[in-house]
């Protein structure tokens, strides 16, 4: 099974001005595509060559895991954002955030603090844990909640420097502030609904 680069669901300039076309082009067509090419090379003629991307993430380690997880994480990141998104949450995710964090503003502040305070490269996640409670998680490098079995991902934000250095240089806080204008609450609602049914 050849791992392919998932198609973006919006144009490269669709997230501008919050994330520029230049950033999205490099991030998607260079970084994300690079992980795909590298993984296919690594799994050739191995048992992983017949497995799905998600199974590779769950079962692998080392370089194979790093590249597989980065493919999965990036796809989830693209879907966590969208044009004409952002603003206040709605539907089930709004109610669940209020239930587990007290208010959207509390959640937004806590999540932003995690994203800005994370040392080095990684990811910030909103996930549903085994107690059906929304939690904020942070993972280093290619880590994700699926591999760590710490929760079912609902949303993610990429805090590797390549996600923001073209647009914001070393100012991660400004990138995080801009990211809130792109959050795809419809995607979050879909993920929450599926997660609550498991």
Curated annotation (Swiss-Prot):
GO terms for cellular component: cytoplasm. Binds 1 Fe cation per subunit. Fe cation binds at residues 27, 74, 158, 162. It is found in: Cytoplasm. Its cofactor is Fe cation. Pfam families: Sod_Fe_C, Sod_Fe_N. It catalyses: 2 superoxide + 2 H(+) = H2O2 + O2. Destroys superoxide anion radicals which are normally produced within the cells and which are toxic to biological systems. Homodimer. This is Superoxide dismutase [Fe]. It comes from Plasmodium malariae. The lineage of its organism: Eukaryota, Sar, Alveolata, Apicomplexa, Aconoidasida. The gene is SODB.
């Amino acid at each position: 099974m050849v791992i392919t680069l998932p198609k973006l669901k919006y144009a490269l300039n669709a997230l501008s001005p919050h994330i520029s076309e230049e950033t999205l082009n490099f991030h998607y067509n260079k970084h994300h595509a690079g992980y795909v090419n590298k993984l296919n090379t690594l799994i050739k003629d191995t048992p992983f060559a017949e497995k799905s991307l998600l199974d590779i993430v769950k079962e692998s380690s080392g370089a194979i895991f790093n590249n597989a997880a980065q493919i999965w994480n990036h796809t989830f990141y693209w879907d966590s954002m969208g044009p004409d998104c952002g603003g206040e949450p709605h539907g089930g995710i709004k109610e669940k955030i209020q239930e587990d964090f007290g208010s959207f503003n509390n959640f937004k502040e806590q999540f932003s603090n995690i994203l800005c305070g994370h040392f080095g490269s990684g990811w910030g996640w909103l996930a549903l844990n085994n107690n059906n409670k929304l939690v904020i998680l942070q993972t280093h490098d290619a880590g994700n909640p699926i591999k760590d079995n710490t929760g079912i991902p609902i949303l993610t934000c990429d805090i590797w420097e390549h996600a923001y250095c073209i647009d914001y240089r070393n100012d991660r806080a400004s990138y995080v502030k801009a990211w809130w204008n792109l959050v795809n609450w419809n995607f979050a609602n879909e993920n929450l609904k599926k997660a609550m049914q498991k």
